[in-house]
């Protein structure tokens, strides 16, 4: 299997695309950290471990291994705990899929600073925080892969979604002993080894 022996963190894996990515990685042999705060699509309201537990149950029913983490990507200390969950449960981390996102449907002149910052904190800061927390492990083991998700709202815009355009189009570009290749609306890890002297 392509990902046999690998450990993957998938943020926003309690449902939708994130769940499908987590399931696909598990089917390919990876052990998966299912990260999801279990809130609404807007990121508001009560949080719950249930969505993540449902993804975990499907993976385990299919013979895979997974653990659930409910920390938020939008906070540095929280993001470090997400990576720590992988290391504590499976001994390492090989793949980070930055999929977590929230939605604020609002036309620009009605978007509040709080709405703007909420999206920036999840989409942009969250991608940086989780990637940065994993980067130290990637450097130490000399390998790793990032997958950064975006949407058509981030690439070409969408009426009523000004908060999504900027953070999605500003996904991190990384230069480390890991690789990430971005094209169209999905980013996928490359199979090439790190170039000598990559910083």
Where are these regions (language model features)?
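Canonical Rossmann dinucleotide-binding motif of NAD(H)/NADP(H)-dependent dehydrogenases/reductases
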Residues: 3-34
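The beta1-alpha1 cofactor-binding region of Rossmann-like NAD(H)/NADP(H)-dependent oxidoreductases
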Residues: 49, 70-84, 113
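Substrate-binding pocket helix/loop in short-chain dehydrogenase/reductase
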Residues: 59, 107-108, 115-120
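A glycine-rich helix->loop->beta "capping" turn
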Residues: 62-65, 85-98, 104, 143
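A short, exposed helix-loop element centered on a Lys and neighboring polar residues
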Residues: 131-132, 176
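Residue(s) in the substrate-gating loop at a strand-loop-helix junction
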Residues: 151
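The catalytic Tyr-X3-Lys active-site helix of short-chain dehydrogenase/reductase
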Residues: 154-157, 162-170, 174
């Amino acid at each position: 299997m392509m990902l046999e022996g690998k450990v993957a963190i998938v943020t926003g894996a309690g449902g939708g695309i994130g769940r499908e990515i987590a399931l696909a990685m598990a089917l390919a042999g990876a052990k998966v950290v299912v990260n999801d705060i279990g809130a609404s699509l807007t990121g508001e309201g009560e949080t719950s471990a249930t969505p993540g537990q449902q993804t975990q149950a499907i993976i385990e029913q299919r013979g895979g291994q997974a653990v659930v983490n409910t920390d938020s990507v939008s906070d540095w200390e929280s993001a470090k705990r997400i990576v720590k969950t992988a290391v504590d449960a499976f001994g390492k981390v090989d793949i980070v899929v930055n999929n977590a996102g929230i939605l604020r449907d609002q036309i620009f002149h009605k978007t509040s600073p709080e709405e703007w910052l909420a999206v920036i904190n999840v989409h942009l800061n969250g991608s940086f925080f989780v990637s940065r927390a994993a980067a130290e492990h990637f450097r130490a083991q000399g390998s790793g892969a990032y997958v950064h998700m975006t949407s058509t709202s981030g690439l070409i815009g969408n009426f009523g979604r000004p908060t999504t355009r900027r953070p999605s189009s500003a996904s991190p570009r990384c230069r480390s002993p890991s690789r990430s290749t971005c094209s169209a609306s999905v980013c996928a890890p490359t199979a090439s080894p790190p170039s000598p002297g990559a910083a």
